[in-house]
Amino acid sequence: MAPKSLAEQIADLEDLTPRDYDPEDIERGGNSSDEDVEVKDANAGREHYQAVGKAKLRNEGPVSLGKQYAGSRVSRDALEAESDEDPFRARSSDEESEDESDLEDEDEDGDEDEDEDISEGSEDERPSKSKAHSLKGREDADVGMDSDDSEEDEDGEGFDDGFSDEDEDISGEDDSEDDEDAKEEEEEEEEEEEEEEDDESEDEEEKTAKPKRRVQFANAKVADTSDDRAQLRQLLATDQKTIAATISQAAKADATKGRAVKHQRATFDALLNARIKLQKGLTAANQLATRTQPSEDADTDAFKSAETAALTLWSTLEDLRLTLVDAQTQDDSKKRKRPSPATTSTSTSSLWKRMAELESDSLAHRRAILDKWSLKVRGSATATTLANSKTKLLGTSGAQQTITAVLDAHVASETTDRSSKRLKSTQGSTSDPNEVKVYDDTIFYQSLLRDLVSQRMSSTDAITNGLDTLHILPSRNGAGAIHPITGMRKDKVKREVDTRASKGRKMRFDVHEKLQNFMAPEERGTWTKRAREEFFASLLGRSASGILREDDVSDDEDGEKSDEDVEEGGLRLFRS
């Protein structure tokens, strides 16, 4: 700010209006004064400086570095190709899923290789360019100085007075030294230019050869990747087909096995059902009397009808067995010829002979089939059960016995004398040497029933079948409970006893579920004494006792009341 004059200062003193001082104005004034001082200090002592224009190096325009630094067009194959300087890059054809990532890595490597090639060429050319650029800058500076000197001479202003003769001598010596340096630099430039031309020719040859090799390598690599992908797709397709076929075959095999097991279980249940129905007949047949001479009065018609029915059943069974034997024989020439049907005239010996021949022909095949499927379907639980039953019957380990041996042992143990199975036998029958043998498979029959009951009880249909509601009968000795059908003995269950409930350490009580949430009702239907008194007192204005006393009058009072009116006597209750 310019200093105020005397008149302005006097005017400020005479002005009585209050002034508001802003602290920011003081700061602004101080800053402005400091800036003025700094500007003055910065320009002080530089009045004799000559104004010089901006140098070419300081121009903001782009600097032309040459053709070798200019960009060039590159094909996509050459861009994606791998660098020739990395020929030992391993690439696995099995890992085809990582081809895309590998291609991207190779593209990045190719770009880096190109950048390295350019950087190598630029490093060779930088010294020459920098030197040439520095020489050109010096020449331009010399030319600028000469032009400035000429302008100063033409203007003829009074700048020569500020320079002395000594300065002119120094400037002359500097000019001579600059001329010598310029000559040396020109010679160096010529040598460097020749070297640059040689390098450029070599670089051009390398540039023309590299794209060709890259294109060839890229084509070979694309062909390899396409072949690898095709092979991988083919392998995947075959693997998928193989896996699908394996899974389908396994599923079909499991389904077939399941259907076969269901069919076997159904057949076994049907046979067991038939055996259960025949149990009563077998028991009754074992209790039949010995063969006696028929009496003359016997009914011949009944015998003939029974004989005809038995022969019909026997013929049906024989036809069934012949059909099974023919199904086992594939050769038609070896099939058995069907005999004539049995009649009443056929002898018993011929019938027995035909049965024995059929049995001998089918025995080997039946035993082989039984052993085969017994080994296949034998599980851990079944094996344990069979082993226990075999050891009881044979006294040997169950693993060493086959199903046919077990069946033979059952048959041998079940064929006994008739006399031993009779409940009541005579003395003469026990000593008869020609006693007839009978068949009794009670042990085997009970084992079949046990297996059936355990299977049904373990299945989910145990509740619906009602097997869990069977009554358990107590045994005689109290060791356990016996099932009424299977005869199996249930192990005795140990009663749980609380050992801490003795000596008063724990209260003994039983909670009745029906009484747990029960509340006794209040009897509100009958009248109590208090309720009756309250009712009559509120109704008649008197207590019930007083009302009841009026009824207990003496005989004298009754005589006096006889003269009164009946209506008046009836209203006596309402008198005061």
UniProtKB/Swiss-Prot annotation:
It comes from the Eukaryota. Disulfide bonds: none annotated. One of its GO terms (cellular component) is nucleolus. Residues 1-227, 328-351, 414-433, 548-576 are annotated as: Disordered. Residues 39-49 have a biased composition (Basic and acidic residues). Keywords: Nucleus. It holds the Pfam family TRAUB. Coiled coil: none annotated. Residues 95-123, 142-206, 552-568 have a biased composition (Acidic residues). It is found in: Nucleus, Nucleolus. GO terms for biological process: maturation of SSU-rRNA from tricistronic rRNA transcript (SSU-rRNA, 5.8S rRNA, LSU-rRNA). Signal peptide: none annotated. PANTHER family: AATF PROTEIN APOPTOSIS ANTAGONIZING TRANSCRIPTION FACTOR, PROTEIN AATF. Belongs to the AATF family. This is Protein bfr2.
